[in-house]
């Protein structure tokens, strides 16, 4: 297969993994687009994206326009004369004139099995909803949000032990493999594009810190899914004794209870069992303010009086 001249557009670590795969391939990455440097850390020092750092380390020209809607930026991109543009978690909207510029157009690697979970947080929403599988879709980009024709799909079972962090790692490995397969198919003309079924489409909205508050009026099953979805960010939590307590790991208990939602049923080194609207949730790993995450046994040693049976955990901030 003849090497393709590729423009790569991406910003976070997930995107950098895909850029590295292209750099390891026989294709030519002729330019990299990434978001402008942002203030980060306590000193708010301007910090380059992981994609920029990788591009600079490999002596690839880097472009960081604040927008691709203006003609000078579009002309600069067109001057690269790329065969194709690969977009992975870039963060800027690509207008139609940009999508039409490369000979083979623009393709995107998305962390879900489209058309399910279009949008910003597909990995987290798959866990949040209790999906049994997820995967990667490589699509031909159009002007919509993740609405383009699908070129290649891979699937991955979601395990009970998975969190957003672990799924992210799995998809960050699966995505680059799918990307290289799709590029080969595009170059050879062997890929058959598949339209997305709009009837099956839904949107993966960004997570919020407010959404991470545990609502004991939900089912134990749903709360278990949410704790996994919100790990490592924004991390599920509840308010108790005037403190915000983060919850990193739970499981659905086989215990049954008629107690009011939010009531502690039992507390032992095996876990703190809390009644919900449907079922009992066992808290296994938590984080007290200013402390590291700890197993419940250690939490009870430090603050056992907070978690006595029949204590009611608040649904709202106290």
UniProtKB/Swiss-Prot annotation:
InterPro entries: Fmt, Formyl_trans_C, Formyl_trans_C_sf, Formyl_transf_N, Formyl_transf_N_sf, Formyl_transferase-like_C_sf, GART_AS, Met-tRNA-FMT_C. The keyword Transmembrane helix does not apply. It comes from the Bacteria. PROSITE patterns: GART. Its EC number is 2.1.2.9. One of its GO terms (cellular component) is cytosol. It catalyses: L-methionyl-tRNA(fMet) + (6R)-10-formyltetrahydrofolate = N-formyl-L-methionyl-tRNA(fMet) + (6S)-5,6,7,8-tetrahydrofolate + H(+). Attaches a formyl group to the free amino group of methionyl-tRNA(fMet). The formyl group appears to play a dual role in the initiator identity of N-formylmethionyl-tRNA by promoting its recognition by IF2 and preventing the misappropriation of this tRNA by the elongation apparatus. This is Methionyl-tRNA formyltransferase. It comes from Shewanella baltica (strain OS155 / ATCC BAA-1091).
């Amino acid at each position: 297969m003849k090497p393709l001249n590729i423009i790569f557009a991406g910003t976070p670590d997930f995107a950098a993994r895909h850029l590295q795969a292209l750099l390891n391939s026989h294709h030519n990455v002729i330019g990299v687009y990434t978001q402008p440097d942002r203030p980060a850390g306590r000193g708010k020092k301007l910090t380059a994206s992981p994609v920029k750092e990788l591009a600079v380390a490999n002596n690839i020209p880097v472009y960081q326009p604040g927008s691709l809607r203006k003609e000078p930026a579009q002309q600069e991109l067109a001057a690269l004369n790329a065969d194709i543009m690969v977009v992975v978690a870039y963060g800027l909207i690509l207008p139609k004139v940009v999508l039409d510029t490369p000979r083979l157009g623009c393709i995107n690697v998305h962390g879900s099995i489209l058309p399910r979970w279009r949008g910003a947080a597909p990995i987290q929403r798959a866990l949040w909803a209790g999906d049994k599988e997820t995967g990667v879709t490589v699509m031909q980009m159009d002007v919509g949000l993740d609405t383009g024709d699908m070129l290649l799909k891979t699937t991955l079972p979601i395990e009970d032990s998975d969190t957003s962090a672990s799924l992210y790692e799995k998809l960050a490995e699966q995505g680059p493999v799918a990307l290289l397969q799709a590029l080969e198919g595009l170059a050879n003309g062997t890929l058959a594009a598949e339209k997305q079924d709009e009837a099956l489409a839904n949107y993966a909205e960004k997570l919020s810190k407010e959404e991470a508050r545990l609502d004991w009026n939900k089912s134990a099953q749903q709360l278990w899914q949410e704790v996994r979805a919100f790990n490592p960010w924004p991390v599920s939590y509840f308010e108790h004794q005037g403190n915000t307590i983060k919850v990193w790991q739970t499981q659905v208990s086989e215990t049954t209870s008629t107690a009011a939602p939010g009531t502690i049923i039992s507390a032992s080194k095996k876990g703190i069992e809390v009644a919900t609207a449907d079922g009992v949730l066992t808290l296994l790993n938590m984080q007290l303010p200013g402390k590291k995450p700890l197993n419940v046994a250690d939490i009870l040693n430090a603050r056992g009086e907070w978690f006595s049976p029949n204590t009611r955990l608040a649904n709202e901030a106290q």
